[in-house]
Regions:
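Cell wall/extracellular polymer interaction/catalysis modules
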Residues: 1-148, 152-169
Length: 169
């Protein structure tokens, strides 16, 4: 599976892009302008992490003391043969609204309405994680090595090249 990110707009407060998966436009991306990944080829891995569990009560989303849950998160591997044990301080895909609180070269997924702001990020992030999980299960069932490649291209214009879209192939 190949995932392409075309960076379209470079502004002082954000780097806006579009994610294309399997020849279809999946969602928009957002990155911090001075801490984004350089353009190139990367691999994606799913890593299980321990996260505090949110309490069942609707009061202020307090965390339950001492209770954790296992969450699988997509991580961008900067070195090809090294898979980290944790996702702390790693480049990864995250939900969010704006790039200014981003760290570690992470990428926000969502629907872009204005330059530097995305909406519906939780929905896009969950769909992306589900898509990656299905791909890993499909590859595991066929006894093939799990290869998910991420290609980041600095495009600089709003139009995505037609040869990357499915209807023009």
């Amino acid at each position: 599976m190949n995932i392409n990110i075309f960076r379209r707009r470079f502004t002082p407060w954000s780097v806006d892009g579009t994610m294309v998966i399997g020849g279809k436009i999946f969602c928009d991306t957002l990155e911090r302008p001075n801490r984004h990944l350089p353009a190139g080829r990367y691999k994606i891995s799913l890593i299980p992490t321990k996260q505090k569990k949110v309490s069942e009560t609707k009061k202020k989303n307090k965390y339950e003391r001492g209770k954790y849950e296992i969450v699988i998160k997509p991580v961008i591997l900067l070195r090809s043969n090294y898979v980290p044990r944790t996702v702390r301080r790693r480049a990864r895909f995250v939900p969010g609204n704006g790039p200014l609180r981003l760290r570690n070269k992470s990428i926000i997924l969502g629907r872009s309405h204005y330059t530097g702001i995305v909406t519906q990020s939780e929905k896009c992030y969950n769909e992306f994680c589900q898509l990656l999980d299905e791909e890993f299960k499909r590859m595991k069932k066929k006894y093939l090595p799990c290869r998910i490649n991420l290609f980041i291209r600095d495009w600089g214009v709003d139009e995505i090249p037609l040869n990357y879209l499915l209807i023009f192939q």
